[in-house]
Each structure stands twice: as C-alpha cells, then as structure tokens.
C-alpha cells in the first residue's frame, strides 16, 4: 500500500471537491470525502493508559484495531456529553514517514451533516489568527452559501501522534499499544 491518501473527490468538471461535513459545537468542519472510510455510531472504546487526553483508546472494527481520538479535545474545545448524534468517522490517514503505509483512525465528532460539493474558487487559505486549531490542520475555508466550513487536512490532524503504530490487525497482537504510542510521542 502506498503512503498517499487521496484527499478530495473531484466532480466531473474537475473544479469542485467533495467534503463530508460534521459539527463540533456550533462550528462546521469538512473532511475530503475520499479520506472517509465509514461513519459508525458511538461504540465502546477501550482506553489506553498514559496517552494524551484526546486519545480515547482503540476500537475493534471487524477484526481491525483502530485508534480513536476526540477532535474536541485535540482542538482544545470544551468537552460535552455524548448524544445520540455523536459518532465516529473512520478515516484513512497517510503514514508519517516516507514509504510508510496509511492507517485508519477513528474521530469522535458531535454530529455528521452532509456531503458538500465546493467549488475550488470558493476555498480560501485559512486565516493566521484566532484559532485553537493548529494551522497545519486546516486545509482551507470553504464558502458555502452564507456560511463558512473549516476544511481539515486529515493527514495533519492524524499525524505526529504515533497512532499508526497502534493501528492494525486485532489478531496480530502488536504488543502494548500505549507503550508504542508513548515511544512515538
């Protein structure tokens, strides 16, 4: 498997990209639709000791161990109680090192909205101020009708965490994931 993850689906005319949108509080975010593998309801997450607060643990999804992060915590947003709309987006993230394989990552979000087709001419660079989100995590700002959608760079959101080291086959038993995550940090 190569280390690149296609980041956006292009429309037939090649001038639009498709994004799955979701909410964290009142803010709407978007991820390139081709990076999203599936959307699942909130299921039990097995916690990992001695990991950052935003790393909620791992899930076993059809025999595959998938690390799960809470995007609210990662972005420094206040925590809220989970609701019936809270779900996990399973996304494909490029490996951090050149030549390393991509891996799947679960992202807990407040709710999923819709798939938007955004014209590239309506995507602007992110502002350089006033956000708790690292600038490398923002791909751009999508203008859609009367709102702005924060478009995330999933490879940056999921990178620099060592999470690919704890992703894998549940039956392979890849050692102690918490220790691997600590060593990668």
Map each language-model feature to its residues.
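An acidic, low-aromatic, low-complexity terminal/linker signal
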Residues: 1-185
């Amino acid at each position: 498997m190569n280390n690149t993850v296609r980041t956006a689906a292009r429309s037939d005319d090649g001038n639009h990209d498709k994004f799955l949108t979701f909410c964290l509080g009142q803010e709407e975010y978007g991820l390139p639709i081709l990076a999203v593998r599936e959307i699942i309801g909130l299921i039990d997450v097995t916690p990992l000791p001695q990991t950052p607060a935003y790393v909620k643990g791992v899930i076993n999804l059809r025999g595959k161990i998938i690390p799960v992060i809470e995007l609210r915590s990662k972005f420094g947003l206040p925590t809220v109680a989970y609701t019936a709309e809270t779900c996990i987006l399973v996304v494909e993230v490029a490996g951090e090192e050149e030549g390393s394989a991509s891996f799947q990552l679960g992202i807990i979000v407040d709710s999923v909205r819709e798939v938007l087709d955004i014209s590239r001419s309506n995507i602007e660079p992110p502002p350089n101020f006033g956000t708790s989100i690292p600038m490398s995590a923002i791909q751009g700002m999508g203008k859609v009708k009367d709102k702005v959608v924060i478009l995330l760079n999933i490879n940056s959101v999921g990178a620099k965490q060592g999470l690919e080291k704890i992703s894998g086959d549940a039956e392979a038993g890849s050692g102690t994931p918490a220790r691997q995550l600590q060593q990668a940090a």
